């Protein structure tokens, strides 16, 4: 069936929270193929948000129209897409009928083909939760990375999968910022986030003088599909930089806790030795795995050399991976960090023939609009 053209409509205010939805908004039915799942969606919400609201966990990443994790194909129906990056869905794809579900609103009953999905996750993922937390620690890790530790208060626990992220709500506003958890469910009394401080950033300002130990912060989540795929056996390559350490550390902690026997090569990119952190714990976690290597990739300076039994290479992280991983086309690759690093890594993987279904990534974008 040929795709229907996308209709253009004025921008909509949206949220998956039931209390913010318009009870009189027109409703439509969405049928997802090839999984044969049907749900209801209102004209006041994005399709991805409607899925979250009804416990359907579609593949997704940024939820801001910047990545392509939720890209799908409209088989039938009228859909409008707004406020998205053409790098995630270009004009030719839009003309063909592709949409990003995180930025798409339905104006009729629709049939949508899911291009990326995990059958085990669709109806069995972790539910989205609203959690009231209390700040228990704010600790600088480097000159621009801060560890923020939150203790769940109401409810008293927070369920998530290693590698996922949460929305942290900025107190006194309706705004939020998204950050990945570095911890696992083995520490139910606290959740740790590793946050990069950007000049002028609103959350960075909070970390400087806006919040203190004992203050409350609301979070919503978990989100994201940057998780270990159970039952997979391929070697794993982790490539990270900056605050991209958080989800990779969560994955590594989880693998150590569960006795995972897969091979892991972990490459972390930084400018100088002073930009490295959590190295001792990473090496300790690695000693509990079957086949683990950690390589620090320093792009600007090797002086002074890092202390301890750590492998260090000179150069950008993607260049180091290219030299050391000739068989990366036969590995599952997890990428997390600044967009230029992720884009360079994706080019490397494409050149080496790594299948797309073996690549999982999160881009940590800076809040330039602040």
Swiss-Prot record:
Domain FAD-binding FR-type: residue ranges: 128-229
Record's compositionally biased regions (Basic residues): 1-14
Domain 2Fe-2S ferredoxin-type residue range list: 28-118
Superkingdom of source: Bacteria
CDD domains the record matches: fer2
Record keywords, A-Z: 2Fe-2S, FAD, Flavoprotein, Iron, Iron-sulfur, Metal-binding, Oxidoreductase
Cofactor note text: Binds 1 2Fe-2S cluster.
Cofactor requirement: FAD; [2Fe-2S] cluster
Pfam families noted in UniProt: FAD_binding_6, Fer2, NAD_binding_1
Signals that turn on the gene: By propane.
Protein's UniProt keywords contain Acetylation: no
GO terms assigned for molecular function: 2 iron, 2 sulfur cluster binding; metal ion binding; oxidoreductase activity
Binding site for [2Fe-2S] cluster: 62, 67, 70, 102
EC number: 1.18.1.-
PROSITE patterns: 2FE2S_FER_1 (PS00197), 2FE2S_FER_2 (PS51085), FAD_FR (PS51384)
Subunit-structure text: The propane 2-monooxygenase multicomponent enzyme system is composed of an electron transfer component and a monooxygenase component interacting with the effector protein PrmD. The electron transfer component is composed of a reductase (PrmB), and the monooxygenase component is formed by a large subunit (PrmA) and a small subunit (PrmC).
Record family assignment: Belongs to the TmoA/XamoA family.
Descriptive protein name: Propane 2-monooxygenase, reductase component
Organism: Rhodococcus jostii (strain RHA1)
Biological classification of the source: Bacteria, Bacillati, Actinomycetota, Actinomycetes, Mycobacteriales
């Amino acid at each position: 069936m040929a795709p229907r053209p996308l209709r253009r409509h004025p921008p909509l205010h949206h949220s998956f929270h039931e209390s913010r939805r318009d009870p009189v908004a027109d409703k439509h039915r969405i049928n997802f193929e090839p999984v044969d799942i049907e749900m209801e969606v209102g004209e006041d919400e994005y399709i991805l948000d409607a899925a979250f609201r009804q416990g359907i966990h579609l593949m997704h990443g940024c939820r801001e129209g910047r990545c392509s994790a939720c890209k799908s194909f409209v088989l039938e129906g009228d859909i409008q897409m707004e406020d998205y990056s053409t790098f995630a869905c270009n004009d030719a794809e839009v003309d063909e009928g592709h949409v990003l579900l995180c930025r798409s609103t339905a104006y009729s009953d629709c049939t949508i083909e899911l291009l990326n999905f995990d059958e085990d996750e669709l109806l069995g993922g972790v539910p989205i939760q609203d959690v009231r937390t209390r700040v228990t620690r704010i600790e600088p890790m480097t000159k621009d990375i801060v560890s923020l530790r939150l203790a769940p208060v109401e409810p008293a626990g927070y369920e998530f999968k290693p590698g996922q992220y949460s929305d942290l709500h900025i107190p006194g506003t309706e705004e939020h910022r998204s950050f990945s958890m570095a911890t696992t469910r083995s520490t139910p009394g606290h959740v740790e986030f590793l946050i990069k401080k950007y000049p002028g950033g609103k959350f960075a300002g909070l970390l400087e003088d806006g919040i203190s130990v004992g203050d409350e912060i609301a979070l919503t989540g978990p989100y994201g599909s940057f998780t270990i795929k159970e039952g997979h056996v391929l070697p794993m390559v982790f490539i990270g930089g900056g605050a991209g350490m958080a989800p990779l550390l969560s994955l590594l902690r989880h693998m150590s806790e569960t006795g995972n026997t897969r091979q892991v090569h972990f490459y972390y990119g930084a400018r100088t030795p002073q930009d490295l952190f959590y190295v001792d714990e990473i090496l300790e976690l690695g000693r509990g795995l079957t086949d683990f290597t950690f390589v620090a990739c320093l792009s600007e300076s090797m002086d002074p050399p890092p202390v301890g039994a750590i492998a260090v290479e000179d150069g950008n992280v993607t260049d180091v991976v290219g030299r050391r991983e000739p068989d990366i086309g036969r590995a599952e690759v997890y990428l997390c960090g600044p967009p230029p690093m992720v884009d360079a890594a994706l080019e490397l993987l494409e050149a080496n023939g790594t299948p797309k279904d073996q690549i999982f990534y999160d881009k940590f974008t800076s809040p330039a609009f602040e």
